[in-house]
């Protein structure tokens, strides 16, 4: 269902349509729940909680690895600049 702008003198184009209802976003296969399945609502919520925990742990692990790499990079660059400075001042 769409509504059309009826005022031909408006600054907007007259053939522009505006949806009355937002389009449905695609449902993730992992988050799909149906009453016809053998899974109870409580089991579904437990499964979703576990999936969210896994995603949270993965993000935390990725952030930690990134921080370690950044610290190592800063240490190597600092050591390189220190060695260059000592070589130039020798």
Swiss-Prot record:
It comes from the Viruses. Residues 30-39 are annotated as: Acidic. It holds the Pfam family Herpes_US9. It is found in: Virion membrane; Host Golgi apparatus membrane; Host smooth endoplasmic reticulum membrane; Host cell membrane. A motif (Internalization motif) lies at residues 21-24. It comes from Human herpesvirus 1 (strain 17) (HHV-1). The modification Phosphoserine is found at residues 34, 36. Residues 89-90 are virion surface. This is Envelope protein US9. GO terms for biological process: intracellular transport of virus. InterPro entries: Herpes_US9 (IPR009278). Keywords: Host cell membrane, Host endoplasmic reticulum, Host Golgi apparatus, Host membrane, Membrane, Phosphoprotein, Signal-anchor, Transmembrane, Transmembrane helix, Viral envelope protein, Virion. It is a single-pass type II membrane protein. Essential for the anterograde spread of the infection throughout the host nervous system. Together with the gE/gI heterodimer, US9 is involved in the sorting and transport of viral structural components toward axon tips. Residues 1-67 are intravirion. One of its GO terms (cellular component) is host cell. Disulfide bonds: none annotated. Its main location: virion.
């Amino acid at each position: 269902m769409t509504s059309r702008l009826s005022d031909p003198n408006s600054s907007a184009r007259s053939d522009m349509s505006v949806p009355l209802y937002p389009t449905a976003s695609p449902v993730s296969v992992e988050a799909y729940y149906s009453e016809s399945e053998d899974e109870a609502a409580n089991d579904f919520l437990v499964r979703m909680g576990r999936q969210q925990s896994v995603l949270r742990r993965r993000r935390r692990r990725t952030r930690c690895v990134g921080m370690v790499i950044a610290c190592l990079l800063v240490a190597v660059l600092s050591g390189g600049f220190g060695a260059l400075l000592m070589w130039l001042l020798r």
